[in-house]
Amino acid sequence: MKKIALSLVALGLLTSLPGLAATPAPVPTAIASHDGPIRIAVIRNLGSDDNTTQFVAGAIQEGKKLGFKVSTFLSNGDDAKFQDFVNQAISQKYDGIILSQGRDPYSTALVKKAVDAGIKVSVFDTAVNGEIPGVTVTQQDDASLTNLSFGQLAKDFNGKANIVKLWVAGFPPMERRQAAYKELQKQYPEIKELESIGAVS
């Protein structure tokens, strides 16, 4: 009798679970009624390092799941090429543009130009000044990354070490890391920077 009661409870739970499952969100009208595939341009101002490879692969994979056609463009740190890619995406009337690693002073104007053309824009680690309505702006917490890694270095070497810094100026995440790094140098004067090296490739 106990087995039958347990089986009925289990069956009851299993049959009620579909009713508790979250119903999928409705597809936005703009997407559902779109003529042809939705075209997204992913434009990144870095080379094809491991991080970029993962970033681009993730964008393509997610786009595919949504039925989007995703095109990717890498400018290898060449600001003129990056701007050209963005302008081409605007003139080719992409439905959406994802920008990564755009720099000052040009990124804000490019984002506004795309929005004015009716293109949805999302930016990651891109220098955008002020709020632009409808634009999604995201960035990683570079100060925390710096504090964690530098803090571990200070702990491992009792606050005394000679280091080589890998850094490239001008990219928003690198600039945020540099600001945190300068503060940490004041706290740990016995950690000496012997050299700073880095290039975008």
Model-derived segments and spans:
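Bacterial N-terminal signal peptides that target proteins for export
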Residues: 1-8
